[in-house]
Amino acid sequence: SFGIGNMTQANSIAGALESALRIAPLSTGIVVALLCGLVVLGGIKRIASVAERCVPLMAVVYTAGAAAILWLHRDRLPDAFSAIFQEAFSLRAVGGGAGGYAMMRAVRYGVARGIFSNEAGLGSSVIVNSASNVKEPVRQGMWGIFEVFADTIVMCTITALAIIVSGTHLSGAEGAGMSIEAFEGAFGRAGGLFVAIAIAFFAFSSILGWSYYGERVVEYLFGRKLVGIYQLLFIGMTAVGCVGHLELVWSLSDTFNGLMAIPNLIAVLFLSNQVFAITRDYVRRVS
């Protein structure tokens, strides 16, 4: 939770607000850490409730806006798809061992960013799914699969295409700044402001969700007595994420993700027979 859960999320908020509103990352870090502390330590759930209510609507509006950008630049879509595959698999500029290294880096960053998007294989979303009030675990698991599809295949693909067809990937902007510039190009300053605010809500709600993940794990491993210390560390690292260098924050997050994924994937492998048996039983009963 100290990487993907708070530092990268806070860094995205800081980058978005700095790009759209010229707000200093340090100021953003103080405010985000304060709001996070009010919810995590102070139990002020109204802030979390507002984010929870706004995020679904913003997600719909954001997706519609990105789709509108694709429609405005629909003549560039074939070139966009071509550029994606050429940059991913072309080895024109390198050869031999260097070509293999380039391919390895492309796959490595693709997998790393995909994991950041959907948390697949980390075992984190299971904490929330297991707390749901459902009679059939298979049904809940299928919803988890759909979440990955909707988030990565739909929203992330639309975002990437919107950035490419609008040309903002060549502007020198980083991170959230590319999406903001894409929306500003299509809808003016209001579009950029909307994306900045939407990213802030998306990321802040993710921070709160990951704080819950971490609290449950600390409570399970060490008991309630250390939860307070974890909460303070989590809030502090959230502020650090806002002022940290983008590449450093992402590298730390990728490392932490790997440390979570390895033991979880091993456990999934050993439990796969049980999962297959439960799934086959569920399909047999509902078909």
Describe these PLM feature segments.
Residues 12-17, 24-32, 36-85, 218, ...:
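Membrane-interface loop-to-helix entry segments
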Residues 1-4, 30-41, 59-70, 157-166, ...:
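Hydrophobic core segments of alpha-helical transmembrane domains in multi-pass membrane transport
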Residues 29, 134-150, 224-232:
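Membrane-interface alpha-helices at helix entry/exit sites of multi-pass transporters
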